[in-house]
Amino acid sequence: MTSRTEAVKAYLLDLQDRICSALETEDGGARFVEDAWVREAGGGGRTRVIGEGNVIEKGGVNFSHVFGSGLPPSASAHRPELAGRGFEALGVSLVIHPHNPHVPTSHANVRFFIAEKEGEEAVWWFGGGFDLTPYYGNEEDCIHWHRVAEQACAPFGADVYPRYKAWCDRYFHLKHRGEPRGIGGLFFDDLNEWDFDTCFAFIRAIGDAFVDAYLPIVQRRKNTPYTPQQREFQEYRRGRYVEFNLVYDRGTLFGLQSGGRTESILMSLPPQVRWGYDWKAAPGSEEARLTEYFLQDRDWLGQ
């Protein structure tokens, strides 16, 4: 393990600790349970799960560090120069599914890949971001989420937030449904356009921003009363979350194709979901407004 990899690993382990602590404090009831695991083909990780709390119905904050002699197809398909290289992949990935349908689901990920081959220069990149999936939209929450994202990106250039916001909108899109998964945030991959230290500083800024972006929204919405019908709608919309993760998500596909730990990879799936044949929201309802207004390609900071 190189000094670069060691520095990234130390940061990611600390990030996992800090996020878990903040979420436990906010929930006020449930605690994370840790499952340390070893990957037979190389590496391991710390899966931490939480559930049936005061706020969080199901959540997980995972750290993994895996390595192998060759990259799986999901990682090398768009980068053919990586074929035949050994690799290390480190990351923290989290998903939080709250009980209350007025509290959005959140997802964040920061990761580092390095691929090496004897006699050749190492190829490395960072990836990550965070995105928000509301069930009942609120403009105040959307603006706050994107404002924190913009502030995290600002020291690295005025063009960074718009680029990675647009990438997030493109990435978290269910092509077969013709709709986005949520209201976006940031997404980036293959990041090595700056030197290593700057790229590493950037993912630290993104990782550190998650709690500031999410917890104020949780605090505003966690005590909002809700009906059984609103809970049912939340479960229906969670179905879209499952569809995206199992069909499109590169992290999920990479994990499964590289022999990753299935329980940790599928931790992101919500605990209760429903599908209904050709279900449609009533015209003029809050449920209809979610897709008509919030789940659109919108400039939340420019309106």
UniProtKB/Swiss-Prot annotation:
Q: Catalyses which reaction?
A: coproporphyrinogen III + O2 + 2 H(+) = protoporphyrinogen IX + 2 CO2 + 2 H2O
Primary residence: cytoplasm
Establish whether keyword ATP-binding is in the entry. no
Stretch list, region Important for dimerization: 241-276
Membrane spanning residue stretches: none
SUPFAM superfamilies on file = Coproporphyrinogen III oxidase (SSF102886)
Q: Listed GO molecular functions?
A: coproporphyrinogen oxidase activity; metal ion binding; protein homodimerization activity
List the EC numbers from the record.
Answer: 1.3.3.3
List the GO cellular component terms.
cytoplasm
Under Pfam families, the record lists: Coprogen_oxidas
Query: Would you say which domain of life the source belongs to?
Result: Bacteria
Task: List the GO biological process terms.
Answer: protoporphyrinogen IX biosynthetic process
Q: In which pathway does it act?
A: Porphyrin-containing compound metabolism; protoporphyrin-IX biosynthesis; protoporphyrinogen-IX from coproporphyrinogen-III (O2 route): step 1/1
Which top EC class is given?
oxidoreductase
Q: Which residues form the active site?
A: H107 (proton donor)
The UniProt subunit note reads as follows: Homodimer.
What PANTHER family does the entry give? COPROPORPHYRINOGEN III OXIDASE, MITOCHONDRIAL (PTHR10755), OXYGEN-DEPENDENT COPROPORPHYRINOGEN-III OXIDASE, MITOCHONDRIAL (PTHR10755:SF0)
| Family designation | Belongs to the aerobic coproporphyrinogen-III oxidase family.
Protein name (record): Oxygen-dependent coproporphyrinogen-III oxidase
List the source organism.
Pseudomonas putida (strain ATCC 47054 / DSM 6125 / CFBP 8728 / NCIMB 11950 / KT2440)
The beginning of the lineage is: Bacteria, Pseudomonadati, Pseudomonadota, Gammaproteobacteria, Pseudomonadales
